[in-house]
Amino acid sequence: YDMAAVETLGWNVLTNRPKEAAYRAPGAPMAIYAVESVVDELSQILNLDPIDVRLKNAARKGRKSSYGPTFDDVGLIETLEAAKAHPHYQAPLGPNQGRGLSAGFWFNFGGNTCVSLNVNTDGTISVIEGNPDIGGSRASISLMAAEELGVPYEKIRTIIADTASLGHNDITDGSRVTFSVGLATIKAAQDAIQKMCGRAAQIWGIDADAVTWEDGAAVPAGENAGKFPPLSLAEIAAVSFETGGPIAGHFEVNADGAGVSFGVHLCDAEVDPETGATKILRYTVFQDAGRAVHPSYVEGQMQGGAAQGIGWALNEEYIYGKDGRLQNSGFLDYRIPVASDLPRIDTVILEIPNPGHPYG
C-alpha cells in the first residue's frame, strides 16, 4: 500500500523441528494475512467497502515500496477494479455464508541465467537451459523462442540440461524462470538470427548489414541490397555445413527489472454454526501476470496457489508428539485439499506489461 512512512521489524527464530526445503510462497502469505486483516478491520470500523478502502490506499507507479525499490507499473489498482466489477463480488449470500477478500503481492526475481540455442539442419530448434520445469516454464520458453525466430511452436524443443553443461544458472525460485530464462532465450535467438542473416548474406554475395529478419526468414534490406527471394530458417539451416558450420546463439544475463506482481482473491464460504464445518462455495482469482505467455499454465498456477492457500487455512497442520516427532508425516494424515473439497476456482488474468522485459 501507499504509506508515507513505514518501519518494519523482523526476527529470525531458529527452530529445529520443521525441515528446510523448497516450497511455494515462502513467508509472503503470512505477512499479507496480517496486513489484510488490519485493512478489513479498518473497513468495518469506517463502514466502507473493503475494495474502496484498498483502492484509496493502493500502491502506485513512482511510489517507494516498504522494502526499498520504487514501483514501476503496478497492477494492484487494476486487479481491485476488476474484482469490484466482477459478478462474484455482487452476488447475494445466503444464511451462514460470508465473503472474504484479500490482495496479495510478490516482488519477483531475475537472477543469473545462461541459455544456448541450436539451429538444427532439419530446421528445428533446440533451446538448452538449466532450470527445472516445475510450473510449465518449458512451454513458455519454447513460445518465446518461436515468437522471436518467427517459426512454429512445434519446431522448438526446450531441453533442461544439467547445470554443468551451461554457465551458472540460479535455482528455480522466486518466480524468476519465465522472466530471466525467457529474457536470455530471446537474446540467444537474436544472436542466432544475426548469424543466420550473415549466412544469407554469404549465399547472396552481399554485406551482412544489408540483410534483415522478417517472419522467420532472411530478406534483403534496402535499395542496394539486391532482389533475392527470402531464405527461410529451414533453408539456411539445411546448407549451414556448406556456409560455415553449425549455427547457434548464446546469451548470459544477470537479469534485473523483474516487475512486482499483485493479485486479488474473492472467496465465499459457508460455516455450520453447530459443528463449525466449513465449505468453500465460490472462489475467484484476479492476477496481474505482466504478460501471460502461456495462459493455460498461468491459470493452473493461480488455481494451484488458491488450493494451497485453502489447505493452509482449513486443513493443513503439522502435529508433533511430546517427544518432538512429527505425527502426521504422510498424506494419509496430513490433510491437503482434494478436488471434492473445492469449488471451481475461476481465474481472471490481467496483463499490465513490465517495461523491464521485451515481452512484458
Placement of each model-derived feature along the sequence:
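C-terminal catalytic domains of large/alpha subunits in multi-subunit enzymes
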Residues: 1-106, 122, 144-360
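Conserved beta-alpha junction segments in alpha/beta enzyme cores
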Residues: 99-125, 129-132
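Short, small/polar residue-rich loop motifs at catalytic or cofactor-binding pockets
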Residues: 111-113, 135, 263-265
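P-loop NTPase nucleotide-binding module
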Residues: 139
